């Protein structure tokens, strides 16, 4: 503590007000703790401000534009459809503002003290919060670190006006004529799809042999087919070597199939992963155990090697997902309050807002087989569903991974319209230990996309009505 300084006492101090931190703070307050939350940026973190929410708003706007231009098959002919991109950005910002304002209201409504600034650990019960020229010391009984992550910057692709991270791509002032996306993971696919919908010529360079390596190849193939239809070029096994930036664009050099090639574009978007924000917290002062990737090691209650300090979200091992961070935030807050809460990741869903959307929860078929689990893989296509046909959006399928010995659902994958919403039912099924018969016997409204889960369950039972499997 600085000589002459006074410390403000709190019971639980949360560092970071993203989807993990603010949820942890609210849950801790609900459990009767005096809570202080420290945030150096805007409330809501990356997710609400420059991630999940604005990207989905941009994607939604791009789909509206594409549908307006390409609905001739349904008898809708629209000529001279234009984009007011400044208005798109204004609308996107309004969505963000509503949600961040909502977070502030929730924190204040739960009597959580909000402190602006950067927190540095002095010891296991003290942080120093710096905000510009001012600083304040806080002491705490327990702390929850929820500082999130930031985009990885490649050595030969330093972020600039033309070489963008995801934040830069979300905040462009124009629809670019051309865009090179380095990285075919979920961020690259989502933003590449959005700009392709707006009319941008998009090229995706992926270093691996397939895009969306965390999903099944058949799912990736469907997305690639749709991307090709939009005019997107996907180059796999491509190694991005460097970029030459000009005032009006950038030239990217890459290697593919043993050849060195170049491509010109207005902008380059680099989406090759994220780095945990753990390097500027002073964690070395308190001896918290870390992995060699800068992640904080935690137990099943999100407790670090320092017993009164917890960590959640992108800074701990596991997928960097907002809903995972929120879940861990609740667990950490409850653990501090003495509850026996512990994480269970068996039903954490993953979603890509691609076109069509794809989602997964629990086991993939091959993953289950690799672990020696005898499974039934039951698949039902969107093309056999009345609602999908009425939407004129029939690419994709729903697959259930069912344990053969007892019929319990242990995994599910969906690629198709509204997959992001449909996966929730199957996450519940896995969490509750439900069987394929449980889903098959549940009456699903007709005509809906949700019926596809029931139909796939009937396939698993060998009693499908709307598909021939023999």
UniProtKB/Swiss-Prot annotation:
Reaction equation(s) it catalyzes: N(6)-[(R)-dihydrolipoyl]-L-lysyl-[protein] + NAD(+) = N(6)-[(R)-lipoyl]-L-lysyl-[protein] + NADH + H(+)
> So where does NAD(+) get bound?
183-187, 206, 271-274
Subunit structure of this chain's protein: Homodimer. Identified in a complex with PdhC.
What cellular-component terms does GO give this entry? cytoplasm
- First-listed, main subcellular location of the protein, grouped into a coarse class: cytoplasm
Fetch the PROSITE patterns from UniProt: PYRIDINE_REDOX_1 (PS00076)
What GO molecular-function term can you cite, just one? flavin adenine dinucleotide binding
Q: Does the keyword Disulfide bond apply?
A: yes
Enumerate the residues binding FAD: 39-47, 56, 119, 314, 322
InterPro entries, A to Z? Class-I_Pyr_Nuc-Dis_Oxidored (IPR050151), FAD/NAD-bd_sf (IPR036188), FAD/NAD-binding_dom (IPR023753), FAD/NAD-linked_Rdtase_dimer_sf (IPR016156), Lipoamide_DH (IPR006258), Pyr_nuc-diS_OxRdtase (IPR001100), Pyr_nucl-diS_OxRdtase_dimer (IPR004099), Pyr_OxRdtase_I_AS (IPR012999)
Lineage top rank: taxon: Bacteria
| Gene3D superfamilies hit by this protein | 3.30.390.30, FAD/NAD(P)-binding domain
Cross-referenced PANTHER family: DIHYDROLIPOYL DEHYDROGENASE, DISULFIDE OXIDOREDUCTASE
What are the positions of the active site? 446 (proton acceptor)
- For this entry, the protein name equals Dihydrolipoyl dehydrogenase
* Gene Ontology biological process terms, A to Z: 2-oxoglutarate metabolic process
Per the entry, the cofactor note is: Binds 1 FAD per subunit.
Its annotated function is as follows:
Lipoamide dehydrogenase is a component of the alpha-ketoacid dehydrogenase complexes.
Cofactors needed by this protein, per the record, are: FAD
Q: Which residues form a coiled coil?
A: none
**What species is given as this protein's source?**
Geobacillus stearothermophilus (Bacillus stearothermophilus)
Asked whether the keyword Oxidoreductase is assigned, the reply is yes
- Disulfide pairs? 47-52
Q: Which family does it belong to?
A: Belongs to the class-I pyridine nucleotide-disulfide oxidoreductase family.
